[in-house]
């Protein structure tokens, strides 16, 4: 059996490979130009296991190894780095560290990997989010033009009447040209976002899990689909705190002895899902009585920012439970409040409100 530790970069990779039968160790650098990578891995005989750390440019490599029938294990970058105690860091040494973790039983920090379909749906959601951010920047610019010429329409500026009022403003030649171009671009963005929204809604309605999440007040197709595809298999999380940790909705902690110091959110998880949960909370807290009471209580205690985060976390945990137990909002309400620490409903694990543990998961 051949075990390969691979330090993967955008243009090259360094490998450290050991043959478990002969004990031979091979170190090599492969450039990604041409067919050098394919030829090397295709030439390996017998069972082969390759280990890499998760990166943003690894997809092509995973697909290549899958095509060649080679098993690839993807590791958590921070945990792989934590295994290195030496002060010297270079590509060859990084490959050796990955190899060492692969050789030592149960030491390699595997992460959960989404399926091809889930990755494709994530692309759809990220694409929509990028267009929405572009629209927001464009709206700010057009609002500035309107305010500078005493047109105070607020959100009504994006209605047909508001756009006509903006179009009718008498501006100098270059300002007029800029206004017209921005308005034309805004209309194009609106059409594209509407197309993407329709695609997201179609996907959400076709998926039983997402349809269940849509039954929760304030949760729309984008949030429902994103929760399903970014959380993945809900049973891989043992507690609610693990879900919050995975999304980055737990505070950083610097405690020692009897003194506990909690800081800002870790924000180590998926930023898009964290954003969508926070936005959905604004609607859910109006329509759901329990969430509304919780948000108002935190608003008095902690202020608006922390109250929104706390309510978003609570909403996200609800959606996770609905995914895990395959129930809709009506059944969730029938069961009552979340179980307290140490208690559980029939068929449900206890809700752990203690310290969050690190969760192995996809870095996408």
Where are these regions (language model features)?
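A detector of single, family-specific signature residues
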Residues: 1-364
